[in-house]
Amino acid sequence: MKLGEHEMKSNQSVADEIRKYMNYIYLILFAGITMWYYLYSTVLEYKYPYALYLGLRYALMAYVLVSIALVVWQKQYSTVLEPVFMVLILVSAGIVTYAVKDYGVFDFALLLVGAKNVPWKRIAYVYLCIAVVIQGIAYYASTTGIIADITMQADRGVRHSMGIIYPTDMAAHVLFIMLVYAALREKKLTFVEITMMGVVSYW
């Protein structure tokens, strides 16, 4: 084997090893930030440490920079414009964040760009686990009187928030949970599953 080919394989092996660990790092950061925003949408009294959230965001920013550098170094893009587009997403999100003073836009852009080369199933599974656990805790707390159950009068009756800050937000959370579950199944849902989803949606 030629020396040049050996070096190329060695570099590829190192890059693959780095990418594997970076996938785990991304999932940890994704989990932490998802928990922050999900808890923020509930009326649970637990206060997620803001310092921890800031640390996660800065770590995610560093991760994204390293990720883009690896994409360019290993030429892991379909066109030359792909890394440019990734940078433009971050710049645009940064401008919007500066204008509206809402870091949610920039955080979402960081998570979007950082997700490149991370298996989507792992991301979806992490989200589903976090969403189901927090939603379940919020539901239990609201139905047992531990926290307030915010209600809203609608045409078909009273709508309950089930521990979320607003009934429509709760409906959105439940919808996302069902969509992610259906996507992870990757096959036709059973009649029982469809019926349960219909009942939950109506409720």
Please describe what each predicted stretch is.
Residues 1-20:
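Short, Lys/Arg-rich, polar N-terminal cytosolic tail immediately upstream
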Residues 17-37, 56-74, 81-203:
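Hydrophobic transmembrane helix bundles of membrane-integrated enzymes that assemble
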Residues 37-53, 72-76:
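Short, hydrophobic transmembrane alpha-helix segments
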